[in-house]
């Protein structure tokens, strides 16, 4: 499906729906905050890209949390204002943004998410693990304390079995 650019100044404008998706995901992953802000009026009108999953089962909001530690909070705020779901789950793992923050050891993002009133602090992924369970099995004392302090769901994971594969999945970029 061809798209036409309305002005020459819209250098991000692309020719096909696939190119559009790839460019948007790339800006979410590696672009700067200003590039994302420039897209806001266009994406907000037709928000399908905000909810589209890539081949790894991730939406744009997951890409930001995984790959742009420095600007994650600002970009996530912009995406949510455009209509992205702050509680969206990765399709393949069921991980939430809070799970991703634990996995990437992004303490600033984790604390910010815990303070956002609409974030589900008790989200459970497809392996039945909360973000706290991940921090527990990764032996990340700083993250565990952050989650406890900010009232995330921190039930005792002792009775929950976790294999070595599950633990390695936390630290790999599947």
From Swiss-Prot:
Domain of life: Viruses
Pfam family, one: Ank_2
Entry-linked InterPro entries: Ankyrin_rpt, Ankyrin_rpt-contain_sf, NF-kappa-B_inhibitor
Coiled-coil stretches noted in the UniProt entry, renumbered to this chain: none
Record's signal peptide: none
Keywords of the record: ANK repeat, Host-virus interaction, Inhibition of host NF-kappa-B by virus, Repeat
Repeat (ANK) residue spans along the chain: 56-88, 93-123
Molecular function (Gene Ontology), one example: NF-kappaB binding
A GO BP annotation: cellular response to tumor necrosis factor
Family: Belongs to the polydnaviridae I-Kappa-B-like protein family.
Function text: Suppresses the host immune response through NF-kappa-B inactivation. Possesses ankyrin repeat domains required for NF-kappa-B binding but lacks the regulatory regions required for dissociation from NF-kappa-B and degradation. Therefore, prevents host NF-kappa-B release and subsequent activation.
Protein name: I-Kappa-B like protein C1
Biological source species: Microplitis demolitor bracovirus (isolate Webb) (MdBV)
Source lineage: Viruses, Viruses incertae sedis, Polydnaviriformidae, Bracoviriform, Microplitis demolitor bracovirus
Gene coding for it: C1
